[in-house]
Amino acid sequence: MGLTTCPNCGSPNSAVKQKKNKHKGVIISIIVFALIVVSALGIGISKKAKELEYYSNMETVSFTMLDGAAKAENAGNLIKSVWYNAIYEERNSETDQYTMKNGKFVDDFNDALSELFADENFSNSISEIETNQYEVANLMKQLKEPPKKYEEAYSVLKVYYDNYLKMTKIVISPTGSLNTFSEDFNTYDNNTVDSYEKMKLYLD
């Protein structure tokens, strides 16, 4: 057994002191290493959580836009039908209530469109599209700073959003002539569908 003090003078044995210091240094190194590992794990977990949240919002906004686009497609097709039938005096069970009064066609297609937008059911459908726009806008705000993993997906999503906005806006406030409205609406409709198909590549 080693002596902790000198038998001659009673001073502490330096070998024992060095051994204690060595053990202390090892313990400190282990603690520092453990803290680094825990910190790295924490950063990794936080990064993964942010990626999962981002993906969830990206998926939600993609399907929310699809729902809004479907509503806009239905409304836009009805607008085209009312507009066309009012001009060319075509009878149709779906549009007669807007294009005809007292058994006769209205003199101005604008009157028919006004009747359509004043209709409670159609007005509610337009309100649903506007609500959809609001929900989509709020979700898009949360996606402005994508993780590196989703930067490419966000670029595709922005194009999808632009096409979705054009499609929903033209239905909420139709302008131009029947021909220009129909052409623009069909273009926005097709572009929105194409954008969604591209976006699906980034969704599980």
Go through each PLM region and give its residues.
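Cys/His-rich metal-coordination motifs, chiefly Zn-binding "fingers/knuckles"
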Residues: M1-K22
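Sec-dependent signal peptide cleavage junction
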Residues: S39-E53
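C-terminal amphipathic alpha-helix
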Residues: Y55-E115, D119, K149-D204
